[in-house]
Structure formats: structure tokens, C-alpha cells
């Protein structure tokens, strides 16, 4: 079939398998052209491995450090008549290229929050890898079925303690509008912490450690975003921020557990990028459109692969890591450059419907958004007939 982008709200409901493969190849080429990661990991588990930062971590470990990788994700395959999810095509492409390079690459499809998927992962590590020396935690999910209670909990994107009104960008209608959000209830805050906080990360590390599949000296990191003042009301000081603060708490006990065997656990702070998750946050499209304009003009603009490759090379496995007072690894320092933030703040209230394309890089934002789904990739013929039924050989599918 010939596949064109169809966008509804903050989701593109079509995906392009050839475009997704080309996007993965671009990221691999970036890593291989920037040289190996010295003393990098060799056997890596990535939880949330199919898109965005998790995919970038898998690519960086495999092609920057020659690592065997096991990826966990929750995606949907395509059929002859309907495209699958972008994450499915990304993972199929990654495995193809990794296998061509002689690397082990296998994937588990299922709910990473479940005990079942944790057990299948442990069994696969024991059978195929023995032990892993890096665990990357990069889940972004709107809800979680708690493995102990069976309750399905939802996360909420709301301020805490007060209602907030802010400028946002309606990406469908391409207009600036005021968005008002009521404060989260305590139940909504607790739910967001349960879905997006550190409990599941801790459960993963506990399960892996108890099963004896963590190598001595193993490291783990969970990805987070902190942002600057302009996004704080909705982000760091909001319900999501409560979940992020929970990560900061949970990492301490995880670190103690791994340190006993010469290992380490860190929260890694990454810059704002266009992802399916960030495009759902009301103020982020406007913030990102301004940020892209400023950072591109300064020559400091980065996407997922530049961020994560740099994180592994400079901080996770580097001699002089970028660490903050809380012990987090920081890869977002170029975004937080005061010059960058001051320019974004100065332009924030000046953007109108009329000057949107001149004042911001909304065009770049839209391109990045479509690239998530395999569109707008250079060199891809989007008028060609493609088969959306792409197989991932050897996938362990716990959903069937």
C-alpha cells in the first residue's frame, strides 16, 4: 500500500515502515561516525526500547559499544492492510542492522509493568546473555496495571496546589491559545507517581538482582526531564514533577543495592525533544518550537540520538561525568544555557498566529513530529508501494 501521514491531535495514525527504517539507519550512522564509547557496556537491557530516548540508548549501546541488546516494549505489528506502530518498525530495523553487524539483538513485546514480562525477560537473559551490565529504564505510559493489586492507575498532567493558565500551541489548527488546567487532586497525584515514578524501575532492578542476572559493576539509569522555569508550573511543580521527585528518591535505594557489587544507579536528565509523549503536553509544542529556533541558531540543537550517545560517552561511561548536586547525570545543559532560556522567555509572549512561522521553528517541530512515524525522512520514496507487514524474527511476544 501507499502510506501517507494522517494526523489526529498529537498522534499520527499512520506509520511508514521504510521511513522508520531509514530513521533508525540515520541514528546508527550518527553513532558510528562519532566513534566508539570507551569502556562502554557489553550486554544491555533497555526497558522501553522502541522509540525516542530508549531506542537511542539501544542504538548507542549496540553501535557505539558493540553491545548485545535485549529490548522490552509494547508495540503492534502491521498487517497487509494496516500499518503497525512506529516502534514496531523501528525495532525491526534495529534488529536487522544489529544482526548484520554480528550483534545479538532480541526483543520482548508486552507490558513492562507486569510480573510476567519481568520473568520472561529474566529467563531470556539467563538463556541468551547470562547477565547484563547496563539496564536502561525509558518507559513513557499513560497508565499502569499494578502487578500486585491488579488495579489500573492513570497518570495526569496537571498543576499542583493551584490552577494554571498558560500559552499553548494547538498543533492541529496552528493557532496560539490560552490553556487553563485545574489543580490535580491527591488521588491524581498519587496515580501519576504510581505510573511515572520510580516504583516499577525499582521492581525491575529488584527482580533482576534477585534472579542473579545483573553483572558485578552493573549500572542502571532512568531517563527524565526537568526543564526550566517556563515549564515548571505544569512540569516540575505539577503532578508529573511529583513522579520525577519519586524517581530521585527511589534511585537512592537502587544505587545502594548496586553499589554493593561495584555498580551504580543514576537518574539521567535529558533535553526536551519531540516525542509522542511530549507532544501531548499542552505547552511543549510552543516551547519546543522556540527552543529549536534558538538552539539551531546557536548551533547547539540536538535530538534523541545526540543526547543519549553523549550521555553514555561523556557521563555514564565517561571519566568526568556531568553531575548535579542531586547526583543526577545531566545531558540537558545546552538547553538550560541561560542565554538560550532568556531568549525563549523573551519571545514567549510575542508569538502570534500571524508570526508563528517567522518567530519560531514550528516548521522544524512539525517535521520532527512526522519523523517519529517514519515520514519526512530524506531519500524515502513516499509514493512507492510498501508492505506494512514487517516481521521481527525471534521476537518473544507475550501479548498473543
Curated annotation (Swiss-Prot):
Alphabetical UniProt keywords: Fatty acid biosynthesis, Fatty acid metabolism, Lipid biosynthesis, Lipid metabolism, NAD, Oxidoreductase
Organism of provenance: Burkholderia cenocepacia (strain ATCC BAA-245 / DSM 16553 / LMG 16656 / NCTC 13227 / J2315 / CF5610)
GO biological process: fatty acid biosynthetic process
Site (Plays an important role in discriminating NADH against NADPH): 75
EC number(s) on file: 1.3.1.9
Chain's gene name: fabV
GO molecular function: enoyl-[acyl-carrier-protein] reductase (NADH) activity; NAD binding; trans-2-enoyl-CoA reductase (NADH) activity
Enzyme class (EC, first level): oxidoreductase
Binding site for NAD(+): 48-53, 74-75, 111-112, 139-140, 244, 273-275
Official protein name in the record: Enoyl-[acyl-carrier-protein] reductase [NADH]
Keyword Coiled coil: no
Subunit (UniProt): Monomer.
Family under the similarity heading: Belongs to the TER reductase family.
Pathway assigned to this chain's UniProt record: Lipid metabolism; fatty acid biosynthesis
Catalytic activity annotation: a 2,3-saturated acyl-[ACP] + NAD(+) = a (2E)-enoyl-[ACP] + NADH + H(+)
Function: Involved in the final reduction of the elongation cycle of fatty acid synthesis (FAS II). Catalyzes the reduction of a carbon-carbon double bond in an enoyl moiety that is covalently linked to an acyl carrier protein (ACP).
Amino acid at each position: 500500500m501507499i502510506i501517507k501521514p494522517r494526523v489526529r491531535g498529537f498522534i499520527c495514525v499512520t506509520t511508514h515502515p521504510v521511513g522508520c527504517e531509514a530513521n533508525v539507519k540515520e541514528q546508527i550512522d550518527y553513532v558510528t561516525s562519532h566513534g566508539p564509547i570507551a569502556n562502554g557496556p557489553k550486554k544491555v537491557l533497555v526497558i522501553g526500547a522502541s522509540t525516542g530516548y530508549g531506542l537511542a540508548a539501544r542504538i548507542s549501546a549496540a553501535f557505539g559499544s558493540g553491545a548485545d541488546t535485549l529490548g522490552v516494549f509494547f508495540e503492534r505489528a502491521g498487517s497487509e492492510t494496516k500499518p503497525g506502530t512506529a516502534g514496531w518498525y523501528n525495532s525491526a530495523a534495529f534488529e536487522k542492522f544489529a544482526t548484520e553487524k554480528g550483534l545479538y539483538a532480541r526483543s520482548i513485546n508486552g507490558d513492562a509493568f507486569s510480573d510476567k514480562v519481568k520473568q520472561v525477560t529474566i529467563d531470556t537473559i539467563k538463556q541468551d546473555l547470562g547477565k547484563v551490565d547496563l539496564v536502561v529504564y525509558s518507559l513513557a505510559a499513560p497508565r499502569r496495571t499494578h502487578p500486585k493489586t491488579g488495579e489500573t492507575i492513570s497518570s495526569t498532567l496537571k498543576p499542583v496546589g493551584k490552577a494554571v493558565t498558560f500559552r499553548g500551541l494547538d498543533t492541529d489548527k496552528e493557532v496560539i491559545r490560552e490553556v487553563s488546567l485545574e489543580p490535580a487532586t491527591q488521588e491524581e497525584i498519587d496515580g501519576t507517581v504510581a505510573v511515572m515514578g520510580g516504583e516499577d524501575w525499582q521492581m525491575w532492578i529488584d527482580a533482576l538482582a534477585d534472579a542473579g542476572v545483573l553483572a558485578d559493576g552493573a549500572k542502571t539509569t532512568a531517563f527524565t526531564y526537568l526543564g526550566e522555569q517556563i515549564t515548571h508550573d505544569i512540569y516540575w511543580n505539577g503532578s508529573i514533577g511529583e513522579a520525577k521527585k519519586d524517581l530521585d528518591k527511589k534511585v537512592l535505594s537502587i544505587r545502594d543495592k548496586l553499589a554493593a557489587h561495584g555498580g551504580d544507579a543514576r537518574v539521567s536528565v535529558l533535553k526536551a525533544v519531540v516525542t509522542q509523549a511530549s507532544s501531548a503536553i499542552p505547552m511543549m509544542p510552543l516551547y519546543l518550537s522556540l527552543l529549536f529556533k534558538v538552539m539551531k541558531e546557536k548551533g547547539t540543537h540536538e535530538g534523541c540520538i545526540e543526547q543519549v550517545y553523549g550521555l553514555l560517552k561523556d557521563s555514564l561511561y565517561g571519566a568526568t561525568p556531568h553531575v548535579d548536586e542531586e547526583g543526577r547525570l545531566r545531558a540537558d545543559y545546552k538547553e538550560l544555557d541561560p542565554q538560550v532560556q532568556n531568549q525563549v522567555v523573551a519571545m514567549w509572549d510575542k508569538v502570534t498566529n500571524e508570526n508563528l512561522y517567522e518567530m519560531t521553528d514550528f516548521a522544524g517541530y512539525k517535521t520532527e513530529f512526522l519523523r517519529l512515524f517514519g515520514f519526512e525522512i530524506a531519500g524515502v520514496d513516499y509514493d512507492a508501494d510498501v508492505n506494512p507487514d514487517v516481521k521481527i524474527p525471534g521476537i518473544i511476544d507475550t501479548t498473543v
